[in-house]
Amino acid sequence: MALGDKNQGSSKSQAKQKGTKGKNAQPRLKSNQLKRLKINEELKELQSRVDNFVPPSEITLFSELPMSSKTQKGLKSSHFLNPTPIQSLAIPPALQARDILGSAKTGSGKTLAFLIPLLERLYLEKWGPMDGLGAVVISPTRELAVQTFMQLRDIGKYHNFSAGLVIGGKPLKEEQERLGRMNILIATPGRLLQHLDSTVGFDSSAVKVLVLDEADRLLDLGFLPALKAIVSHFSPVQTAPGSRPSRQTLLFSATQSKDLAALAKLSLYEPLYISCNKPGEEGVMPANLEQYYAVVPLERKLDALWGFVKSHLKMKGIVFVTSGKQARRVRFIFETFRRLHPGLPLMHLHGKQKQPTRLDIFQRFSSSKSALLICTDVAARGLDFPAVDWVIQLDCPDDVDTYIHRVGRTARYQSAGTALTILCPSEEEGMKTRWGEKAIEVKRIKIKEGKMGNLKQSMQNFAFKEPEIKYLGQRAFISYMKSVHIQKDKSIFKIDALPAEAFAESMGLPGAPQIKLGNQKAAKVRGPSKEELARKAEKEEEEEEERAVVGSDEESEEDESEGLGSEDEEEEIDDEAEEIDDEEESGEESGSDEETEEEKDASKPKAPAVRTKYDRMFERKNQSILTPHYTALIAHDADNAAGAGEADDDDDVFTLARRDHNLSDDEEADTDAILGAEALAAELKKPLITSEDLSKRKLKAAASKKGLLKSRPGPEKVLFDEETGEAREFYKSGVDVEKEMSAADKRREYLEKEREIMKIQDKIDKEVAREKKKELKRKRKERERELRQMEMGDEPVAYLGGDDDYASADEGRSLSPSPAPSLEPERHAKKQRRGGVQESGAGDLEDEEALALRLLQGS
């Protein structure tokens, strides 16, 4: 610390000496102040260039645009040199803080068209880390948000802004901690609205730029209410009544719709409409895209896809499956094709996957040179997969806009690509009509039978061996049929024309699963716009609610005017309610249809009000107190009590022996207290709910095995006496024993018993050990006796320890009749070694001499 202070003091003195040289010398400015002045001058110059910029007829380089040096450097390092048409048209007015509504074909570079103005606006505003949130980009899918974030990181790496992703898939608390440090936020609408509503301290009032990327897709996914709420949170601030608001809004999409125009009116201020498409060619196809379609029966679509994959093993393609809970169908195709080993890397992507899995698949497919991605429409918008050769639409798209965005994953910017759509025979005419309305030319091709696969037997084997594949097939079948059923354009999607049995058989299923389709009103016929349909639905709901309220009031008034009904009517109401509950549990269509018809017939003569099953459920009364027959019984008892006195006396259970017995006041008070206590005890002993208070359903449930087990007492443990065999309760006997003696006495008695048992057991163990020792000694003596007998015998010796000549001479005859005696010399040698070395040596010499003599005599 001292050294640092000394150095600082010397530097200050030197600066002071330098500053005092000469009479007219000016004080020196600090380096950071000079830097700040330089930056301010650059910003002023840049702002004047932006305000006075007149775009030329054609912009060929990014350097021609009035942008900061940091942005120019980031574009150059990312190899972005030449702007696309949408970029050259949208960036100049966006730099001047104009609201933009842009539309261009897929793959035309709309992302840079809003990222560059976003960075420049914050740079001109001198936005810093302490200023909070300055720009928000809203994307329809997580993958598109991640791609936008990576693009922003590449071109804005020389700026000092902090950017972040809020797309879900992570705990909300972690994202809340990062929100306060972000200058640029890229988010999906659902999670962003959740943070705007629930995160404390999330200030969104200072936002300068709001971007809606792929806005039509946001509306298709049902995010219109969320977008309206988000726009209301980011409300622009106007300095004067006629001035431009401080917030700039950029809205980009490949296609336009009426809902998009309504959203533009809500969020944009005097927007500038920019479109790179020719008049009447909204959403035109890329120039290098080749489009084909083939007509294949529904049951042969997987065969056609398999044949296509086997004939294009070096391609990079995307297979789109119709959305609408189609994650199961994507999984079914992926799992079955994976087991067939196509020779091409397979991947699958859908909205039900976890966020890390989706990002991993997105990155792996982007970096692959040849692969096949099976996905839903989650990958149909905005995602820029490099070098995609083929886009195969296994199912018919929902509409032409979806078709445009799907095929836009290939032929990006100036590259070439091919799109193939596989249609059912019933979908061809309707889809050709829709293509003609958009001036899109799609050529028809015919797939040869030899080029198609035959997967029927393989699918059946998979479904038979693996229950998971069978289950996936069933769910895929149901989800596909339901997705066709809910489509709006019934001129294309005709569920009655689909061969359900053949389709199920092609997936390896033994038969078509039973499907419970919703009401036909849910599948609207092509006609009115979405706004008109929504208004009509809201009016119908309001009318139904009013009719239900009026009907319930009328019914209550009728009940009050008519009085109490009969017992039979109440039982019928209860039976109807039980039938409704049973039908809800079973879920059968036939019963529910019959009941609704009966309800309609019964409701026509009574009243025009609509009474649902929930209304009847809430109208049910307690069977023991509020029912008419119970109140009638109470009134009847009161009449009898008022009219006939002696009859009641005959029916009484308890009769008074003496009525003329007079008691004193104290005795009367005592007897009243005793009787009151007895009555209270009797009432307390009674159950709170009796069988009369319960409904038939409750009584039936109580009579079941499960209900009886609940009401019955639990099992008791019983011990039987060893001497008498008498049964006694386990816990009761334990309590009795505890009462008889204390714990110390019990321990003492227990230890004495155990000592006696151990003494007896010790004696037994000693006897057993003694017997074992005797047996071992007896066996050893018997073995020694056998060895002595063998030594004294005249059996021939098995082996010679002499020269080889004797051994070779004796090879011809066998001296040992059996190999058993060969073990005896070893045993004998061991015994002699135990006895001593000298005796063993003498014995061996005598034996050898005797053997040699015997051999010489024999020869």
From Swiss-Prot:
Catalytic activity: ATP + H2O = ADP + phosphate + H(+)
Highest taxon in the source lineage: Eukaryota
Residue stretches of biased makeup (Acidic residues): 540-600
Helicase ATP-binding domain span: 91-274
Biased composition, class Basic and acidic residues, residue ranges: 528-539
GO molecular function terms listed in the Swiss-Prot or TrEMBL record: ATP binding; ATP hydrolysis activity; identical protein binding; RNA binding; RNA helicase activity
GO BP term (any one): rRNA processing
Comp. bias regions, Low complexity: 814-823
EC number of this enzyme: 3.6.4.13
Annotated Gene Ontology cellular component terms: nucleolus; small-subunit processome
The keyword Chloroplast belongs to this UniProt entry's keyword annotation: no
Pfam family, one: CTE_SPB4
Class of this enzyme: hydrolase
All residue ranges annotated as the Helicase C-terminal domain in the record: 288-463
Compositionally biased intervals (Polar residues): 7-17
Domain notes: The Q motif is unique to and characteristic of the DEAD box family of RNA helicases and controls ATP binding and hydrolysis.
Function: ATP-dependent RNA helicase required for ribosome biogenesis. Involved in the release of U14 snoRNA in pre-ribosomal complexes. Required for pre-rRNA cleavage at site A2.
Subunit annotation: Interacts with the U3 and U14 snoRNAs. Associates with pre-ribosomal complexes.
Protein name: ATP-dependent RNA helicase DBP4
Organism: Cryptococcus neoformans var. neoformans serotype D (strain B-3501A) (Filobasidiella neoformans)
